[in-house]
Amino acid sequence: MTTIRSIDFETTGIPSEADPQAIVEIGWQDIEYDGMGWAGLVPEGRGSFLCNPGRPIPHEAMAVHHITDEMVADASGNVGLIGAPDYFCAHNADYERQFHNPGVPYICTYKVALRLWPEAPSHGLQFLRYHLNLPVVSAEAFPPHRAGPDAYLGAALMVRILEEGRASLEEMVRWSNGPALLPRVNFGKHKGAKWEDVPLDYLEWVANKSDLDRDVKANARHHLKARAA
């Protein structure tokens, strides 16, 4: 049986080279997967704890997760306590990876959802909860933007992904290590168009001459390669 640990971090802010930021809360929910289409949540494999970030929590971050300096003043949790399962998963796992990258493979449920359900109007975790009618216990998924409930909801999404059976764990890890494969253009004169409908010369400009971000340029290269196949 394979253990996949869904995790979520609440933090002091978005990390950068100049300011790595810090974790204020960690949540997790374990999933067991038999490799043949069955997956389920582990009732006793769930929890959350607060972490003292060693710095004041900005009000902008408090406004998202409602964790205050007073709440974490005596917290003793640290990221090492979440252990080393067979896989980690997280929604927008690139974010969690910036705070914890122990060598365990990560699966990004956001990047996988983009590939499995490209026509979904949104791929945010809360939207997918309702769009896919995930069988969650509402009290366990509340409040949003707290680490325990978000890890639980992310695990429910991961179970649905595994039940779909459309990609192996290894394939999902590969997708997660690459760019987010966006279904539609989200900028410029072709905003809203499907990438496969964008003119070839525009794809070439995005891929080779623009200063757009890594994911956007990778999307253009992906579709250029697909057309050349």
Which positions does each model-derived feature cover?
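Short intrinsically disordered terminal tails
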Residues: 1, 228-229
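Metal-dependent phosphoesterase core characteristic of DEDDh/y 3'-5' exonuclease domains
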Residues: 2-6, 18-67, 83-193
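Short acidic, Gly/Ser-rich segments with clustered Asp/Glu that frequently serve as metal-coordination loops
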Residues: 9-17
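A short, well-structured juxtamembrane/interface segment
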Residues: 68-82
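Acidic, Ser/Thr-rich low-complexity intrinsically disordered segments
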Residues: 177-218
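Charged, low-complexity intrinsically disordered segments and flexible loops
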Residues: 216-228
